[in-house]
């Protein structure tokens, strides 16, 4: 008898599963399914098949529901499926709930300044050109390749990629684009900086590490998007078929002066003179999900939560709108092949800072030390 009941229960479970995933219109089966899976939407007798696609590797288990940000859902058809099939992209406001930029309270930044900045000279504004783009200076590109911080798994490492993206380019500028072009390792910084991690960090975590210990090139420790221990092997290592080992002699990339710069004209002078800079922005879900190209504007007042690198500026010929040229770290599939443009503070007769996610309020520069490279 027990065996028959077990077989009957198994049969009902199989039928229920088939009905749930093949939209079988059977009221009795729906009742069975509701007992097993819970009730359906009241507006539909059979719930359309949904796949939950997580867009943030985020563990909610240790948080109360009161601390959670709203969940934004976007529903679209699955390619190649029936009309009733839908994919539900569960999009948490990751930058509001867990920003990849973490500003620690009462932290003292160890800025280094041994010579005046370009924007500290009287009358510097007169020499600022109308347009500047380090991707194309007289036909020469000084910018390093675009990266994706979110592969092979999600990692809140924008603080690394925004900072090193600008710094890679500055090494190329300082060395006049001579071979080899610079590509420092974000993973080594995550492993060995001592502060930031895949749960977030700060520009200072990168530049203080570069000043004190020096950075290593990408081939020393390829990006894995995880938190690892700082070992000699994770500093710079390699492997043979039968063993792995730490490399003893490798190039280190140091910086000299580093500090903060704010404001449109100061930023322009710093960028034109020495190369791209790292800037914080208050990234919004709309920017994250909807930007595909063009000059971005959005009125918002979010706290800074993301780091990007600003490589130049320009003016739209049709609208005469001035914009920043910015590299993100979400891969080439996002935006304008991984880049975006956003209005400067001149937008709407000087109201642009309300529409550009605060990109001009908190930026950082670092001057490469190339004395050991050439």
Model-derived features: positions:
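Cleavable N-terminal signal peptides of Sec/SRP-targeted secreted and luminal proteins
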Residues: 3-19
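Catalytic-core signature of thiol
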Residues: 16-63, 67-374
């Amino acid at each position: 008898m027990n065996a028959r009941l077990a077989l009957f229960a198994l049969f009902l479970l199989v039928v229920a599963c088939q009905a749930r995933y093949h939209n079988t219109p059977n009221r009795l089966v729906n009742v069975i399914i509701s007992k097993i899976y819970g009730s359906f939407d009241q507006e539909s007798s059979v719930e359309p098949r949904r796949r939950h696609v997580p867009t943030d590797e985020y563990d909610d288990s240790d948080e109360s529901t009161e601390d959670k940000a709203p969940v934004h859902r976007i529903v679209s058809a699955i390619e190649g499926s029936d009309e009733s099939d839908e994919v539900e992209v569960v999009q948490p406001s990751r930058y509001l709930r867990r920003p990849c930029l973490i500003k620690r309270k009462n932290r003292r930044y160890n800025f280094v300044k041994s010579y005046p900045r370009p924007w500290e000279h009287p009358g510097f504004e007169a020499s600022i050109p109308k347009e500047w783009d380090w991707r194309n200076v007289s036909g020469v590109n000084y910018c390093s390749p675009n990266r994706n911080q979110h592969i092979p798994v999600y990692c809140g490492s924008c603080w690394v990629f925004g900072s090193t993206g600008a710094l890679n380019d500055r090494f190329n500028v300082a060395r006049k684009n001579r071979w080899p072009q610079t590509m420092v390792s974000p993973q080594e910084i995550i492993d060995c900086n001592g502060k930031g991690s895949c749960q977030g960090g700060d520009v200072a975590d990168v530049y203080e590490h570069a000043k004190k210990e020096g950075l290593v090139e990408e081939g020393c420790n390829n990006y894995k998007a995880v938190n690892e221990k700082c070992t000699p092997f994770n500093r710079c290592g390699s492997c043979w078929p039968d063993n792995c080992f730490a490399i003893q002699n490798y190039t280190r990339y140091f910086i000299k002066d580093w500090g903060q710069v704010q404001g449109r004209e100061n930023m322009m002078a710093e960028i034109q003179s020495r190369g791209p800079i790292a800037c914080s922005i208050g990234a919004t879900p709309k920017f994250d999900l909807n930007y595909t190209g063009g000059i971005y504007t959005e009125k918002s007042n979010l706290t800074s939560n993301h780091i990007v690198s600003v490589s130049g500026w320009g003016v739209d010929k049709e609208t005469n709108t001035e914009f920043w040229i910015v590299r993100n770290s979400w891969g080439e599939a996002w935006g304008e092949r991984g880049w975006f443009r956003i209005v400067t503070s001149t937008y709407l007769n000087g109201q642009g800072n309300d529409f550009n996610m605060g990109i001009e309020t908190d930026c950082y520069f670092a001057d490469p030390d190339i004395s050991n490279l050439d």
